């Protein structure tokens, strides 16, 4: 069973999909920057046989609205918590891809007693470097002037070059979904990522739940060496390096992901 649902959060509508059966253990799946629920349907359907999966469009992305000109990672985490309140879900696992991983870490900081597992997909816990902030500012200027050109360059770059042809349809779907996003949503997310703090301390101590890290061997956005800088921290219980780029969970050809 799949249902489209929504909840009001700070005056904006947050849209999400609900998979599986009520009463099963809950998993929240959070897409990343420029991503929508559309790209994660195969993963949600894979998990729906064991879990009830809540697949969320983050603020300013997909069908979810904007609450302001800056969406901090903490704002995004609060929006996810609003969805969980609406579904009356107290205990859950969370899987976040890229920016969604930053949101998952914020949830790990905010509600650790409610978590039953964390999966960090092609992401990291560190704050932006000055170099990274400069790159974001340049990207924001391009997005302001010509959103279509910005997306045309950004979406295909998510996968390893050798996978681009095989995943052409998936990338087309992602690009079409991204074109519907308001520029405000793109800029607000970039601003929020620049403001996020270092949360690596959360992973330096053992947690009461499993923490799984999934990386792409050829990830152009978050290189494998960045992931390796933290994946031996005490909280990490499992490490997986998949073939592919930033969408490694998709590029690896249906590799089973789970806790």
Predicted regions and their residues:
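Alpha/beta-hydrolase fold catalytic core
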Residues: 1-28, 48-52, 89-90, 180, ...
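Conserved HGGG/HGGXW glycine-rich cap/lid loop of the alpha/beta-hydrolase fold
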Residues: 12-69, 73, 83
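Alpha/beta-hydrolase
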Residues: 30, 58, 121, 241-242
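Conserved loop-alpha-helix segment in the C-terminal half of the alpha/beta-hydrolase fold
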Residues: 46, 205-245, 250
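A short beta-to-alpha transition loop/helix N-cap that caps and shapes the active-site region
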Residues: 63, 105, 123-131, 162, ...
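Conserved acidic catalytic loop of the alpha/beta-hydrolase fold
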Residues: 74-92
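Conserved hydrolase catalytic core segment
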Residues: 89-129
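Conserved alpha/beta-hydrolase catalytic His-Asp/Glu region
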Residues: 128-134, 145-206
């Amino acid at each position: 069973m799949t249902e489209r649902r929504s909840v009001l959060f700070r005056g904006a509508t947050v849209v999400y999909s609900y998979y599986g059966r009520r009463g099963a253990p809950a998993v929240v799946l959070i897409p990343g920057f420029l991503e929508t629920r559309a790209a994660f349907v195969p993963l949600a359907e894979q998990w729906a046989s064991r879990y009830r999966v809540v697949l969320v469009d983050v603020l300013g992305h997909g069908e979810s609205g904007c609450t302001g000109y800056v969406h901090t990672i903490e704002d995004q985490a609060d929006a996810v918590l609003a969805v969980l309140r609406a579904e009356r879900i107290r205990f859950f696992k969370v899987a976040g891809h890229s920016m969604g991983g930053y949101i998952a870490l914020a949830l790990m900081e905010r509600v650790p007693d409610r978590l039953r597992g964390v999966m960090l997909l092609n992401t990291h816990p560190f704050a932006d470097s000055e170099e990274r902030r400069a790159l974001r500012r340049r990207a924001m200027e391009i997005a302001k002037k010509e959103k279509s050109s910005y997306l045309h360059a950004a979406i295909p770059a998510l996968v390893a070059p050798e996978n681009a042809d095989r995943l052409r349809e998936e990338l087309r779907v992602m690009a079409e979904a991204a074109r519907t996003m308001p520029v405000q949503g793109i800029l607000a997310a970039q601003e929020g990522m620049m403001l996020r703090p270092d949360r690596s301390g959360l992973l330096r101590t053992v947690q009461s739940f499993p923490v799984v890290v999934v990386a792409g061997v050829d990830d152009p956005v978050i290189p494998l060496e960045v992931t390796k800088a933290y994946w031996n921290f005490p909280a990490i219980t499992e490490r997986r390096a998949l073939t592919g780029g930033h969408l490694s969970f998709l590029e690896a050809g249906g590799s089973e992901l789970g806790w």
